[in-house]
Amino acid sequence: MDQTPSYSPPSGTAVILAAGLGTRMKSTRPKVLHPIAGRSMLRHLIAACQPVFSHIVVVIGPDMDSVAREAAPHPTVVQQERLGTAHAALQAMALVQQGEVAILYGDNPLISTATLHTLVQRRRQGDAVLAMLAMRPPEPGRYGRVITEKYQTGDYVSRIVEYAEANEQERAVTLCNAGVFCADAASMAAWLGGVENANSKGEYYLGDIIPLAIAGGGHVAAVEAPYEELRGINSKVELAEAEATVQIVLRRKALENGVTMTAPETVFLSADTLLAPDVLVGPHVVFGPGVTVEEGAEIRAFSHLEGCHVGRHTLIGPYARLRPGSVLGAGAHVGNFVELKQATLGEGAKANHLTYLGDVEVGARANIGAGTITCNYDGVHKHRTEIGDDAFIGSDTALVAPVRIGRGAITGAGSVIVDDVPADALALARGRQVNKPERAAEIRRQLKGSV
C-alpha cells in the first residue's frame, strides 16, 4: 500500500506473479482480486509499482480472464502449467524491457513505493548483481532464513535456508526472505533459465536464483523492510488482518491531514478516499471507492458513501446513503434515511428525511420533502428527473420520470407527478379530501356490534 510521493522518472519492469489458485482463501474468486480498503490486492501492488517502474507485466494462470481485466491496461502472460515461481517469472521475460526487473508476488499488496524505490536504488549501487527484500516477522518460524556473510565491502546474502532444513543456529536468525528480487533484465533471464526443479515438489523456485547469482561471482544484497509491508495474504484471516492494518494507516493519514473523526476506529476508508481538511466524520461511517469530500463537510454517523463527490460545508446523515454518480454542491443537506444514486444536488439544496433520489438533477436551494421518491425505472429503462432552482417538493411526492419541475415550482404533499410542472406553478395530483360527519363513530358502533 503506497503512502509516498511519486518517483520520477520511472524505468524498468515489474513482473507481478498472480497465477496462484489461492486455495486457502476457500473462494472461487482469484486470490489477487480479493479487496483491501476497496481495492483489489493486484491494484494495490500495481499502484505501488507505477511510480518506480515504467512497465508492468502480470503473470496469470489459465482461465483467469478476470485477473487480466483487472490488470488492464498492463499486459498479461499466461503460465499454462503451474510449475513454480521461477517458471512463472520466466514466462514474462519475453515482455520485459531493458533495465532493472523486479519480481513481486500478487499476494504481497502492502509493499510501498518507497520500499520498491529503495530496492531498485540498492541494485543500482553496483556492488550487488541481485537485490532482494528481507523482513523480521514477529513469528519467523515458517519463513526461509536469510544467511549473510561479511565481505570487505559489506554484508551480503550467502544463501536462503528453509526452516525445515535449518539447524539451530540458522533458525535463530530473524532476518527472513520476503521473496522479492531485483536485477538487470538480462541477468534475471539467465538465472531463471538456469533454475532446476530438483526438489520434492518438482517445481522451479524463484529463490534458487540466489546461488546462481553468487556462482557467477556476484554479490546478493538484502534490503530490510517492515514486515507489515511484506507479509503475504493467503487466507481470509490474513486478509482481515491486512484490512485492519491498512485502515489504521488510512485513518491516521486522514487525521494528520486535518480531518476530524469522533470515533476513528469505527470509520472505514477506501484506498482512494480523499477527505479535505476540516471534514468532520462521525462514528460508523463507510467510504467506498471513489469518494471525495471538500472542506467543512460533516458526515454524520452510520452513513455510507461510494463513487460520489461531496461539496464544501455539506451536511450528510445520519444514516444517509450516497451511491455512485452522486454530486453535492456546497451547503447541500442529505439527511437521515435518504438515498442518492446518479443524483446532482445544487448549492444549498436539501433532502432531509426518508427520500430516494435517483437519476435526478436538483437545482440550487430546492427543498425535497420527506418521503419523496423519484420513480426512475419503468421495468426496462431508467429515466431522469429535473428539479429547478428554488423548487419545493411536498412531502410524499412521487415524481414519475421522465419529468421536469420548473424553477420555483411547488408540488402538493402526497402528489403523484407525471407531467412537467412549469416554473412557479403549484402542482396538485391527489384526490380532494371529503369529510363525512359522524361516520367514524358509526363505523365503531358497527364494529363493536359485530363482536
Curated annotation (Swiss-Prot):
One of its GO terms (cellular component) is membrane. Residues 258-451 are annotated as: N-acetyltransferase. It catalyses: alpha-D-glucosamine 1-phosphate + acetyl-CoA = N-acetyl-alpha-D-glucosamine 1-phosphate + CoA + H(+); N-acetyl-alpha-D-glucosamine 1-phosphate + UTP + H(+) = UDP-N-acetyl-alpha-D-glucosamine + diphosphate. The active site is at H353 (proton acceptor). Its cofactor is Mg(2+). One of its GO terms (biological process) is peptidoglycan biosynthetic process. UDP-N-acetyl-alpha-D-glucosamine binds at residues 17-20, 31, 79, 84-85, 105-107, 144, 162, 177, 234, 323, 341, 356, 367. Its EC number is 2.7.7.23, 2.3.1.157. SUPFAM superfamilies: Nucleotide-diphospho-sugar transferases, Trimeric LpxA-like enzymes. Residues 1-236 are annotated as: Pyrophosphorylase. Mg(2+) binds at D107, N234. Residues 237-257 are annotated as: Linker. Catalyzes the last two sequential reactions in the de novo biosynthetic pathway for UDP-N-acetylglucosamine (UDP-GlcNAc). The C-terminal domain catalyzes the transfer of acetyl group from acetyl coenzyme A to glucosamine-1-phosphate (GlcN-1-P) to produce N-acetylglucosamine-1-phosphate (GlcNAc-1-P), which is converted into UDP-GlcNAc by the transfer of uridine 5-monophosphate (from uridine 5-triphosphate), a reaction catalyzed by the N-terminal domain. In the N-terminal section; belongs to the N-acetylglucosamine-1-phosphate uridyltransferase family. This is Bifunctional protein GlmU. The gene is glmU.
